[in-house]
Design a protein with these regions (language model features):
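Hinge/lid segment of periplasmic solute-binding proteins
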Residues: 574, 578-587, 648-701, 724, ...
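Extracytoplasmic/periplasmic solute-binding protein
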Residues: 686-695, 700, 724-785, 791-792, ...
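Conserved N-terminal structural module of periplasmic/extracytoplasmic solute-binding proteins
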Residues: 22-26, 342, 430-652, 974-998
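Glycine-centered hinge/linker elements that transmit conformational signals in sensory
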Residues: 781-811
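Extracytoplasmic "Venus flytrap"/periplasmic binding protein-like
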Residues: 611-679, 683, 707-715, 822-825, ...
Length: 998
């Protein structure tokens, strides 16, 4: 009886509480909503009688589906795909309209000047500055879509492409017209040579200055072929606004070319040409005439004994392309010579083993013309081995190409072809799903309550229709890729995974919060897949011009040849030191130079030193690529003369022990000092001596999503006070803010040491906040920190409150969260700019880089001081030739050398590897646009270096410990900082006793 009564009471309480909660939902007081970042549900708003503001991210307001779609889930209404949908029904008149370059009206006559004659052509417009605008008047007799072709001569000797914005009648026709490129053409300076170890040396790449023409196209490869621009009949203004580069323009042409012939029509039109018999000519692909990019230099392959030229141990530059030849618009040209006019087959020994399961597409032109439609998109399938690829029709019948007797120019260009359709579809799906994902986050937050029913399908009426559309569109693209011969088991599995997640979400909307992490991962994977799809890598060894009956050499090794090849490589590994890039000749004046880094970097330095430094001074370089600890090498007597990239604290640590040379006493030091920012020598200065010359510097910039900020009606913060104001605006929508926080955690002791040696500069914002208050890290005599002073405590409190009071994440994936919009603003090192430009094409034009927020001073000015980090070049004390070592360091840190190294590095690895030189003049010579340079230089002038003192390593360690005590254990920040400061000062005092001043 007691049990039954107890059960009845419990049941009564349960039903009563349920009814009570249904009638009066539970929520905190309204005045605490902003402080707690509380997002009320629609039920709470209805209960309180509150009508939300009309805000696209205020998902408490139920927006009609059609309005949501128009605002969020499609491309920008001014994107090219929308432009063509609007104007695609207009004809493409088969006519040509020429506009002389010199007829332009210019905004700045000092940088843009007409010329009556230039390099054999009249009426040329010279554009010698990185800004300004030129406008041409054109009369179009017939309305329609026209392709625009520009005839130009590049003037920029640094090899920068000409970037510009195009407007028609004062308006940008579509978004992509805001960033157009006219490319350089490049060539090898000379044939491949060899070093003293019989390894091939890569020839430097230089611009080939000549007249060339290019149609305006999509630099991101989202659209296949040239852009079409709509013109009404009548007079129009076409304007170019320069963003970067220098150029001479002779002519602008509006035209439409007739459609390409099919292969059958081509054969019929060339029936008079014979199929030339008994011809077999081999050409090495690495011996190219011209290339569109400096990245397309000769490379090497030792995976096959059939790759020529061949050597089992030494480096032979015997291929071209690979990962460097993958972006739309990149081309390689060769000169081929045949004995007579006629029809020939062409076969390439090629390999596409980079993008798993993906095809590579190329267009093949002869003497500047694509001879038939099928040659406009040749598809090379994925294969991890070398293959012989002969362009053929769907039935495997090889194509014949018409060549003239004598020299012909053969060109292969990367094209997107049918993949452009998939790229556009994926971009639209990403645009839609990212917006839906942000709306879901605004309701659920990043960590949804699994027991709560969010009713997302009711709060976001467009959500399930969007998911259904996206899943269907993804499966349609998968089917098309499979039909075209793509590998359905490879990269397309990413599309299937996302489609499956969307299907399950549609079938069970209440499961969406549980699938949120899966959805985020699948969307990020699809964005990455778009990058993979955009890349079309292809490596070439050689190609053959031959008659149809010729026997083609096999492309892959037989078993015994491959086995012997691997045996020879294995034996050679016992006798060849692959860490040595090059050795000096015996008896020659020489120094040993170490580089901590990759072989490709070391080879660039060695190549530059050989053709400039050694050529000018006669001093030879023994270049070694090392990963060992320098201190161990010093103790063992195997240290180099010069280490060119010492970590931030290493020079002073070695100077304390008398192991490195004081450079300030050497001749010419004052001149060298002028190459850098005034503060740049500070971390390498110890007791009046300077022990390194700066090589690199890295500092913070702020990145934000312009599209999201515009939708929210907020501006990027200029001060930290404004920064605090936008945090709750973003948090109310469950968006995040990213600040740098690199704690001293590393999987190995060696990596932990490297983190410590990198210094405090950009590991977090503490030094930045400290410097913005006008405070230094240490007392002027370097015997104690300033952490017991009010300004330091205030900086520490502000730093920790970002995480304790404002809830900022301490660990995050900035790249993916910035792409999805989950983290629309962040302070990060400026190299993220290059990463986002290259690796996030789907948000191109939707974000900007600006200086970091500053602290308002008593006089109303804003202090934007920022910490920094970097590397420096040192000379070891034991060097036998101090003069030669000093000459090398001066040469290495000079503007010309640093700029060339940066350019060579970018040629090798692409724009994402933009070099962070510390040399001011060299920085201005790197391929930044004028706007990018101005932004970075503005912040760079605020950079303040952190000095290195005995025991200084203890600062970073204890700051990390203090940070964790405050953020994780909720201790008082002032007490914690003062407590750990005593430990720091004790260690500094101990080290000063160990390394006393003279």
């Amino acid at each position: 009886v007691i049990k039954k009564c107890f059960a009845i009471i419990l049941a009564f309480c349960f039903f009563f509480s349920t009814a009570l909660s249904a009638s009066s939902p539970q929520f905190p007081p309204i005045e605490l909503w902003d402080q707690l970042n509380f997002v009320p549900t629609q039920e709470i708003l209805d209960y309180l009688g509150i009508v939300p503001e009309e805000d696209p991210y205020e998902v408490r307001l139920i927006v009609p589906t059609d309005q949501v779609n128009d605002s969020f889930v499609t491309f920008s209404p001014t994107a090219y795909i929308r432009y063509i949908q609007e104007h695609g029904h207009y004809p493409s008149p088969l006519r040509s309209i020429s506009i002389p370059g010199s007829t332009a009206q210019v905004s700045d006559s000092e940088v843009i000047q007409p010329s009556t004659q230039f390099e054999g052509r009249p009426n040329v417009l010279h554009w010698t500055g990185q800004d300004g605008e030129a406008t041409w008047i054109v009369n179009v007799p017939e309305a329609g879509l026209y392709t625009i072709e520009v005839f130009y001569w590049m003037l920029d000797e640094r090899g920068r492409d000409f970037e510009f914005e195009l407007t028609i009648n004062g308006e940008r026709p579509f978004d992509e017209a805001g960033h157009l490129l006219l490319r350089h053409r490049w060539r090898d300076t000379h044939a491949i040579t060899q070093d003293r170890r019989s390894n091939d040396l890569r020839p430097p790449q230089i611009p080939a200055f000549m007249w060339k023409s290019q149609t305006l196209n999509d630099t991101e490869g989202m659209t296949d072929g040239a852009f079409n621009f709509f013109f009404e009949a009548g007079q129009h203004e076409i304007s170019f606004r320069a963003l970067r580069g220098e150029i001479a323009i002779s002519e602008i042409v509006l035209f439409n070319a007739p459609p390409l012939l099919t292969y059958v029509e081509f054969r019929a039109a060339n029936a008079h040409l014979p199929v030339v018999p008994n011809i077999f000519i081999t050409y090495e692909a690495e011996e190219a005439l011209y290339k569109s990019d400096a990245m397309l230099f000769p490379t090497y392959d030792r995976s096959s004994a059939l790759t020529t030229p061949y050597h089992h141990a030494n480096i032979r530059l015997n291929t071209i392309g690979g990962p460097n030849w993958q972006f739309p618009g990149q081309y390689i040209q060769w000169v081929v010579t045949v004995p007579e006019d006629g029809l020939y087959q062409i076969t390439f020994r090629a390999r596409q083993n980079v993008a798993l399961g993906m095809q590579s597409r190329r267009s093949l032109s002869v003497n500047g013309e694509i001879q038939f439609a099928e040659a406009a998109e040749l598809v090379i399938p994925y294969n991890h081995n070398w293959v012989n690829f002969t362009p053929s029709d769907a039935n495997g019948e090889p194509f014949l190409f018409a060549l003239n007797a004598g020299e012909n120019i053969l060109s292969l260009e990367v094209v997107m072809g049918s993949a452009a359709r998939t790229m556009s579809a994926i971009r639209e799906i990403l645009f839609m799903l990212n917006a839906d994902y942000r709306r879901i986050l605004a309701i659920t937050g990043p960590n949804p309550d699994m027991l709560q029913e969010y009713r997302l399908d009711q709060q976001i009426p467009s959500l399930l229709p969007n998911f259904e559309y996206a899943a269907a569109a993804l499966r349609a693209e998968i089917a098309l890729i499979e039909a075209e011969g793509g590998d359905s088991g490879g990269e397309t599995s990413i599309m299937e995974r996302l489609a499956t997640t969307l299907d399950m979400s549609v079938r069970d909307p209440d499961s969406i919060p549980r699938r949120l992490s899966d959805l985020e991962g699948a969307i990020s994977a699809l964005a990455t897949y778009m990058l993979v799809l955009r890349s079309q890598p292809l490596e070439l060894d050689k190609f053959y011009i031959h008659s149809p009956d010729a026997e083609i050499p096999r492309a892959t090794d037989g078993f015994w040849r491959a086995l012997w090849h691997q045996i020879r490589i294995f034996i050679a590994s016992f006798f060849i030191d692959f860490s040595v890039v090059d050795q000096a000749e015996e008896g020659a004046r020489a120094i040993t130079v170490w580089y901590f880094g990759g072989r490709d970097h070391a080879q660039i330095i060695h190549m530059m030193a050989t053709d400039t430094f050694t050529e000018q001074t006669g001093i030879q370089i023994s270049m070694q690529l090392v990963q060992t600890d320098l201190i161990t090498a010093i103790v063992s007597g195997n240290a180099p003369d010069v280490l060119i990239n010492a970590e931030r604290s290493m020079p002073v640590e070695l100077a304390m022990r008398g192991a490195v040379q004081d450079l300030s006493v050497l001749p010419g030091f004052d001149e060298v000092r002028e190459r850098f920012m005034p503060d740049a020598m500070l971390p390498y200065t110890f007791r009046g001596g300077v022990y390194a010359i700066p090589m690199t510097q890295m500092f913070h910039m702020m990145f934000y999503r312009t599209d999201i900020f515009t939708e929210l009606g907020i501006e990027p913060p200029d001060t930290w006070d404004e920064f605090y104001e936008i945090i709750p605006v973003l948090h109310r929508r469950n968006m995040q803010v990213g600040l740098p926080l690199d704690q001293m955690r590393a999987p190995t002791m060696g990596e932990a040491v490297m983190v410590a040696r990198a210094g405090l500069g950009i590991r977090n914002l503490f030094t930045t906040l400290l410097y913005q208050r006008g405070q230094d890290l240490f007392l002027p005599d370097g015997t104690m920190t300033t952490f017991d002073q009010d300004e330091s405590v205030e900086a520490f409190v502000q730093w920790t409150q970002f995480y304790t009071h404002h809830g900022l994440p301490d660990f995050f994936d900035f790249y993916n969260r910035f792409r999805t919009g989950m983290m629309p603003i962040g302070v990060q090192p400026w190299w993220w700019y290059n990463m986002l430009m290259v690796a996030a094409p789907e948000i191109r034009g939707m974000w900007e880089m600006v200086p970091i927020p500053g602290t308002v001073q008593p006089d109303g000015s804003i202090n934007r001081s920022s910490g920094t980090t970097g590397e420096g070049s040192i000379i070891l004390n034991h060097t036998d030739d101090l003069d030669a070592s000093w000459q090398f360091v001066k040469w290495w840190t000079s503007a010309e050398t640093q700029a060339r190294f940066g350019m060579e590095l970018e040629m090798l690895m692409g724009p994402a590897a933009r070099y962070n030189t510390a040399n001011l003049e060299a920085f201005s010579m790197l391929p930044w646009s004028l706007q990018e340079q101005e932004l970075l230089m503005y912040q760079w002038r605020w950079v303040r270096e952190v000095p290195v003192i005995p025991g200084g390593y203890y600062v970073a360690r204890n700051l990390d410990n203090a940070f964790r005590r405050v953020v994780i254990f909720d201790e008082n920040p002032r007490d914690v900082l003062l407590r750990f400061n005593r430990n720091i000062n004790a260690e500094i005092a101990r080290r000063l006793l160990e390394f006393p001043a003279d």
